[in-house]
């Protein structure tokens, strides 16, 4: 083969190889582009059912990176379906309560910018717990804190922080409110926020960050609500509201709300005579509330709310060891399950209890006269037997040498059961501590445990002499 033929042969082979390589590169490029764009659409399932992903050509931001033969392929991951909460798991069986959180707001106020608050509570979304309180529109080390013993001013707002984070200057003000309730339906937060004139207040219903509905005062006498979490089952939330006398007959109504819109309002029925500041918890498929009778009884009213047909019944906790303050000595206190006991019914304090079969777990101040100290215990037969007084599993949360205040319940869904937790408001300043001109609080939080536990006392802990006046 002469030199010219060799050159032609080598050139032909090289051209053939180059052509094959070029075609392979085109094929690889086409495959890569096809895999990149041929992703999957996750259709919104009907009736909250999980549906398979259908193929569609679409760009998404949610991607998973897979390395295959040095080629980067992006494919969509179908997002998890968000469902309404139904609280259908059983209640956890507990032996008592263990410490969970404490925010130390008053101690921190001695040297930092912390909001003046009262009426705190705790509520959780499916992944995290938050603390709420009604702020007074001022920090503690601020002349505006003078006179914050007053409950209802137009500057009060509902504050919301992750549980354990004190209400610092960066805290979100969720709404304008001097009375409130909040709950998460599994998809978004609902906030019920009451503000305005005593004789003509407004309740705003804020869902997923938007004002959806409102209702005005129906008795022109301080429309007010729970000061703790509401409860949502299968997308419908319920909240208890009262308008009328704080020491006489009032008009209590139970509101049912769907994604912020009022869908039904029911009047209180049953034997409860006066309802204030209910502490509610899910008791699937219904909701149960333990409230404050500020008129006739130191035994606590119970409201049972049927979430399917909106029917309502009420009664009183059977335990003869009653939960309100002030109250009679335990040896002379009574409850017949149906009626107020007419024992030191006025004024009262917000509190909680929850049923456990025939028994009842409850918390109350240690003092029968003042908002000082705090204890929890179980009363055997306290849910079913009139005037039952057999107390077990008593724990001191705050010793009787320190101030307490309101308390309330919140529920946390675990893997196999629903746990009950509670918070205690630790009030400092006026009216008891007159060296200062302000009134504010910190909180301590406990949750039910099936384990063992020790003893202690968890007061606010601030030295009033270190505090701004």
UniProtKB/Swiss-Prot annotation:
Its cofactor is Ca(2+). Ca(2+) binds at residues 293, 297, 324. It catalyses: Hydrolysis of alpha-(2->3)-, alpha-(2->6)-, alpha-(2->8)- glycosidic linkages of terminal sialic acid residues in oligosaccharides, glycoproteins, glycolipids, colominic acid and synthetic substrates. The active site is at 151 (proton donor/acceptor), 406 (nucleophile). Residues 325-349 are annotated as: Disordered. The chain crosses the membrane at residues 7-29. Inhibited by the neuraminidase inhibitors zanamivir (Relenza) and oseltamivir (Tamiflu). These drugs interfere with the release of progeny virus from infected cells and are effective against all influenza strains. Resistance to neuraminidase inhibitors is quite rare. GO terms for biological process: carbohydrate metabolic process; viral budding from plasma membrane. SUPFAM superfamilies: Sialidases (SSF50939). Its main location: virion. Residues 91-469 are annotated as: Head of neuraminidase. Keywords: Calcium, Disulfide bond, Glycoprotein, Glycosidase, Host cell membrane, Host membrane, Hydrolase, Membrane, Metal-binding, Signal-anchor, Transmembrane, Transmembrane helix, Virion. It comes from the Viruses. N-glycosylated. Gene3D superfamilies: 2.120.10.10. Glycans are attached at residues 61, 69-70, 86, 146, 200, 234, 402. Disulfide bonds join 92-417, 124-129, 183-230, 232-237, 278-291, 280-289, 318-337, 421-447. GO terms for molecular function: exo-alpha-sialidase activity; metal ion binding. InterPro entries: Glyco_hydro_34, Sialidase_Influenza_A/B, Sialidase_sf. Substrate binds at residues 118, 152, 276-277, 292, 371. Residues 30-469 are virion surface. Belongs to the glycosyl hydrolase 34 family. Homotetramer. The influenza A genome consist of 8 RNA segments. Genetic variation of hemagglutinin and/or neuraminidase genes results in the emergence of new influenza strains. The mechanism of variation can be the result of point mutations or the result of genetic reassortment between segments of two different strains. Intact N-terminus is essential for virion morphogenesis. Possesses two apical sorting signals, one in the ectodomain, which is likely to be a glycan, and the other in the transmembrane domain. The transmembrane domain also plays a role in lipid raft association. This is Neuraminidase. It comes from Influenza A virus (strain A/Japan/305/1957 H2N2).
């Amino acid at each position: 083969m002469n030199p010219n033929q060799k050159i032609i042969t080598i050139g032909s082979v090289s051209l053939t190889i180059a052509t094959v390589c070029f075609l392979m590169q085109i094929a690889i490029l086409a495959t890569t582009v096809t895999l990149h764009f041929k992703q999957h659409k996750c259709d919104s399932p009907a009736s909250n059912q999980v549906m398979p992903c259908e193929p569609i050509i679409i760009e998404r931001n949610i991607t998973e990176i897979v390395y295959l033969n040095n080629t980067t392929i992006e494919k969509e991951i179908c997002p998890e379906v968000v469902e309404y909460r139904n609280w259908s798991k059983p209640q956890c069986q507990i032996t008592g309560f263990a410490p969970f959180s404490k925010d130390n707001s008053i101690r921190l106020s001695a040297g930092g910018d912390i909001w003046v608050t009262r009426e705190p509570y705790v509520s959780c979304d499916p992944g995290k717990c938050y603390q709420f309180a009604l702020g007074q529109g001022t920090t503690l080390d601020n002349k505006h804190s003078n006179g914050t013993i007053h409950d209802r001013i137009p500057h009060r707002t509902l504050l919301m922080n992750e549980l354990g984070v004190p209400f610092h200057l960066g805290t979100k003000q969720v709404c304008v409110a001097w009375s409130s309730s909040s709950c998460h339906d599994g998809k978004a937060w609902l906030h019920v926020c009451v503000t305005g004139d005593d004789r003509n207040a407004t309740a705003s219903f804020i869902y997923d960050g938007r004002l959806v509905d409102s209702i005005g005062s129906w008795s022109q006498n301080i429309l007010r609500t729970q000061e703790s979490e509401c409860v949502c089952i299968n997308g419908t939330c319920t909240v208890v509201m009262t308008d009328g006398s704080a020491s006489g007959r009032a008009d209590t109504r139970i509101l049912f709300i769907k994604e912020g819109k009022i869908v039904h309002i029911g009047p209180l029925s049953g034997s409860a005579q006066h309802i204030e500041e209910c502490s509610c918890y899910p008791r699937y498929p219904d909701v149960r509330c333990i409230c404050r009778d500020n008129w006739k009884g130191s035994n606590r009213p119970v409201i049972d709310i049927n979430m399917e047909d909106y029917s309502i019944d009420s009664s009183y906790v059977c335990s003869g060891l009653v939960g309100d303050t002030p109250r009679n000595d335990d040896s002379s206190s009574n409850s017949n399950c149906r009626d107020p006991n007419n024992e030191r019914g006025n004024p009262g304090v917000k509190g909680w209890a929850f049923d456990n079969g025939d028994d009842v777990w409850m918390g109350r101040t240690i003092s029968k006269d003042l908002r000082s100290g705090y204890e929890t215990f179980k009363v055997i037969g306290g849910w079913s037997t009139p005037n039952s007084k057999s107390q077990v599993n008593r724990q001191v949360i705050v010793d009787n040498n320190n101030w307490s205040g309101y308390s309330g319940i919140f529920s946390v869904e675990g893997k196999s059961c629903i746990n009950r937790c509670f918070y205690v408001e630790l009030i400092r300043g006026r009216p008891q501590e007159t060296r200062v001109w302000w009134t504010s609080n910190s909180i301590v939080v406990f949750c039910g445990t099936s384990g063992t536990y020790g003893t202690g006392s968890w007061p606010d802990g601030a030295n009033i002499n270190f505090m701004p006046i």
